[in-house]
């Protein structure tokens, strides 16, 4: 570059820089004021005319007009002359309200402004703004003046100012100033007030006015607040911040929003809301920010001011990119309180956006917003006065349906209650009497929380002979500590138990008095930590059937009798007699007796007759009520009659040593006295001779000396009657009775022999069934020590616990059948306490079954009882075993059939993870098994025997009618990878339970796993009586086939079945699950070569949908050394960890609430689902590359063996799913028997087990699409119109009468 060019360029740069600086200075503070033409401060125009103003300046110009409502405005450029810029303002057709200031200034600087005031004279509108109604004028308390803005359109217009009601003071009038451009300026004192102010003027004899109202404004401002306090919004939402403050009447607050110290000019809303008129006024200003971005987060400041007084408040706005909904317990989730107190549940909710639906539930029932018992505010639930019925589970369900977010948590409320005694409310009024020398039972039923303890006490009455009232002899003495020195009744038993009464658990204590002989007071005291309650039971012993009565009830005319009024001692007192005329019988004519159990008062009546004995009345004071009671004598007078005989004695011949009985039936008034004579000598009682009250004579072991004439004489005051007979003794006295001796000797010998036989049998036999414990189950399951049928015969069957009436069982369609039995669907009415009618499965024999078959089914029943109840096994519900009717076993009904069929049916609906939009319906297994995952090392159900612990079905899975109606069909839900892990986890739990009961399954496969409601799987065909048949004909029919595909090498080669061989089968079962029901070892002949390869360590490749962790678990189960395989407890731990990892990977939170209850409470409310993962929904590729990738290098698979040998052993004839093989001699007929390949259960369904899948080589995989099409986020939801039908349940878990491998 030349020096010249360089100099030119430098000069040009300096020139440009100088020009810019000069331009900036010109535009800055050094700019000259614009020039406005025509000149002058004011201009007068006339209405309808045209106003023209010209403004010249150095930069672009800007006009500010007097009114925006001008008729027509035109701004145009004009000749610039000396100035660079010129603007002309032209307004045509001027109006009166165009009067005002017109200003011109530079656009970029308003500091330099020129203006002029234009009057537009209009005779019809002398005022620029005229108000016919009072227009408010505002002035603060400390303002020195105020302006009445009645400007005029003509500068010389004469205007008068008037005030009404409150006239102006003279000094104020003198200080008033008039300016046609402003109006009147009026001096103002702090407490001056003018109600109405009027500006008056006249034009051409026409009067014009404008009315104003002065309002004195306050300077008070307080309680400035911003709502919401902690605003949180999502990107794209609208942010609304409301700033409010309080002032008094006539206060005017000015609000101003700032963000990052800049004034905000966004859309806003201004409103005022009076809280209480004339005292407090709340004014507010809302800031609305639509379509929020991340740049809008930060601190927003609101300033509220009245004149010079200001208040300021700031809030921090947080902006999130993604929605979320979380809820936790603010305090404890368990609350224990007492009645009458206030309880509040305050969950901590963290959600953006806020939930659009908040519902509280009490024990699964939605709480109404108008509930009088519960008060809801925001997320909180308040119980003002807790009652006992409020105890239970409270659940808050939060949802944002638009975002697909659902959460809930539960609180448990325990209401502690002071003890209450049930008998106090239902006991009869007044004390009761207790019969002497008899057994009595006293019951005390107490309710309280915590459950109260009951203690019995005793207080005897003072035994002094002259006392008629029970004065307690001692303080209350505990029953177990009563000293022998105190009077007491012998106690047989005192026991307490917890029972259900009126749907509440109550403590029921029973005191059994062996014999009643002492009066006193028993009391039961129920005590818990809140207090105690005592019920007194007066125990008055009585030796008569009635507590208050008159004796006797009959008499003979002419006799002297004694009427006795008798009452129970301590219950009645002050006995008094009244004659038929109502006169009180004097005390000297009565006799009072106080006995241990009665008090009586007697009077003597001589020569009684029917006329004067009627109407005697006894009165007494009932002590407990202090009321007088009476009873009237109902004496019956019988006329005197002589005795007569009903029949005469007859002569008899009596064998020696026999018994002689002579009856003398005589009647009379009074009752005659019977006397016996023998040969005219009175007969008296002695050894072998009995005289009964009714006149019967009994002589035992008659001898020759007893022969003679026996005479019966009946006598009373009316005379005597007699009859006689001759008694002859037949036989010799000294000759023994041979028949008796023979009979006695024979009986004694038979008894002795029977006892010896029983002792001999008991010595030979093993321990009885009563001694069978849990550990003995291994012997039951091991037929080598004792035949299984003999062991089962010794197992107990408790008919009281398990027997179910056949008439309450309604049989339905047949679900499956086998060679000798069948399984039918049935409805059982009242089989449990949860549901009225329950769908069950019934196993029963076919018509014509043999006795051996009956014994086999009975053996299965006993083993089911002994094994016990568990959630993940098919459980026993009852049985019908009564003779004369069919033998039936009632078990749980699993509506979705076996797991193998179900998995195959779901191949088109399998997704790895649920999509984020939540449209795909998710399996509910996660929800139902949340507690299993949480406590995976604990047993889900009782591991004890149901025979000893009782059986109550888990309520979470009961199929009551309401829940059954609301259960959603699993076939309408997609199947996820998490469900497959969950199935494996549940089977491991069930097998862990069976292993703890020392039960070996021996046929663990997907076909023997049933699927029930709520995605619960149950193991069937476990350890039952498979070897009870020894009939060789049955074996020849095919039941000797073995499930080789599932068998461990030691079971195939050495016939050894252990829990570890079940672990091998569990690994094959996992392979079935993660291949969605495919047949194991696809494409292989199950022959001797296969078994040898298996023993050498060749294994299956990974299934299509497994991960490396899952496949490694399978390989661990297939370890060649049984002792190196994991136990089922370890598998539960491992799968539980995988299941938890799956949950955490998807960001889900399992929440313990029954979805059916929510649906029941509110049909519109969907079941709470988990927050879904944002990753895409897709299926794992089904090619071989996936399987090889996750296979350990040290494991050789059958696919590699096939490729090495250069052979393709795909089974073309339909390889058996069950993989059942025969002995080596029978392997030639394998293809012919494939239709029978599966072990035939005793009541299995006739179902073919052929594999319908095509098994391809790895090289051929690319030619065919995968089994399951890939799903995107949009098509992951199911077609609502698709009709899904579940296959019939597979009930092949019934007794399989197949002999074990030998």
Curated annotation (Swiss-Prot):
Glycans are attached at residues 69, 97, 242, 265, 291, 326, 370, 380, 408, 453, 466, 505, 517, 532, 607, 611, 630, 648, 655. It catalyses: L-tyrosyl-[protein] + ATP = O-phospho-L-tyrosyl-[protein] + ADP + H(+). Disulfide bonds join 55-104, 150-199, 243-302, 444-524, 565-618, 664-712. It is a single-pass type I membrane protein. The modification Phosphotyrosine is found at residues 1029, 1034, 1150. Keywords: Angiogenesis, ATP-binding, Cell membrane, Developmental protein, Differentiation, Disulfide bond, Glycoprotein, Immunoglobulin domain, Kinase, Membrane, Nucleotide-binding, Phosphoprotein, Receptor, Repeat, Signal, Transferase, Transmembrane, Transmembrane helix, Tyrosine-protein kinase. One of its GO terms (biological process) is blood vessel development. Residues 34-115, 143-206, 222-318, 326-412, 419-542, 545-636, 643-728 form the Ig-like C2-type domain. ATP binds at residues 815-823, 843. Its EC number is 2.7.10.1. Phosphorylated and activated by vegfaa and vegfab. First expressed in embryos between 5- and 7-somites. At 7 somites, expressed in discrete bilateral stripes both anteriorly and posteriorly, and in a transverse ectodermal stripe in the hindbrain. From 7-somites, expression seems to extend caudally from the head, and in both directions in the trunk region, until by 20-somites, expression is detected as a continuous band from the anterior head region to the tailbud. Concurrently, cells expressing kdrl in the mid- and posterior trunk regions converge medially. Residues 762-1302 are cytoplasmic. Residues 809-1139 form the Protein kinase domain. SUPFAM superfamilies: Immunoglobulin, Protein kinase-like (PK-like). The active site is at 1003 (proton acceptor). Belongs to the protein kinase superfamily. Tyr protein kinase family. CSF-1/PDGF receptor subfamily. This is Vascular endothelial growth factor receptor kdr-like. It comes from Danio rerio. The lineage of its organism: Eukaryota, Metazoa, Chordata, Craniata, Vertebrata.
